Amino acid sequence: MWKTTDLCDEFENELQICRQPFRSFGKKEQFHGKIATVKVKDDNVLVKEGLQTLPEGTVLVVDGGASTNCALLGDNLAAIAEERKLAGIIVNGYVRDSSELKNINIGILALGTMPNRSVKEGKGERNISLQFGQVEWKPDEYVYVDEDGVIISDKSLHR
């Protein structure tokens, strides 16, 4: 079993440490996987498309610009991720249906909750580098999450 603290000790100069104040909403507190990215503004159509097409074990990283206008993820989309065996979802934005999310067996990080839904226009970008939390999130790199933090590596560290 790995811990972010141990990975930081062992690979100190090879990691990025995210400094975004995320809250955990999913059932899993610890998760890791290959990164896939989506950048959106108050629109979760590309989030849904990503969840429906990404391979098992992936972590979808959603940059919603920390917008407080709406939630980008709720129980329906999280259930798709669970059904498809994704490792987790990290949202630089907000979620809703938090009481249901805690029973969904994936990792879910977000800034907080917002009760209203997003627009459905399909605007945004996929598979691009994102920057938030003082780190760069690149597709096909690896993210490790537990109760102590979020770290990113350009290679798999999990043994």
From Swiss-Prot:
Keyword Lyase on this protein?
A: yes
What GO terms in the biological process aspect are recorded for it?
regulation of RNA metabolic process
Citing just one GO molecular function, the answer is: ribonuclease inhibitor activity
Cofactor annotation = a divalent metal cation
Keywords from UniProt, A to Z, are: Lyase, Metal-binding
Q: Does the keyword Metal-binding apply?
A: yes
Q: What class of enzyme is it?
A: lyase
Cofactor binding note from Swiss-Prot or TrEMBL: Divalent metal cation.
Instruction: Show the NCBIfam families listed in the entry.
Output: NOT-MenG, PRK09372.1
Subunit structure comment from the entry: Homotrimer.
Q: What's the protein called, per UniProt? A: Putative 4-hydroxy-4-methyl-2-oxoglutarate aldolase
Organism expressing this protein natively? Bacillus anthracis
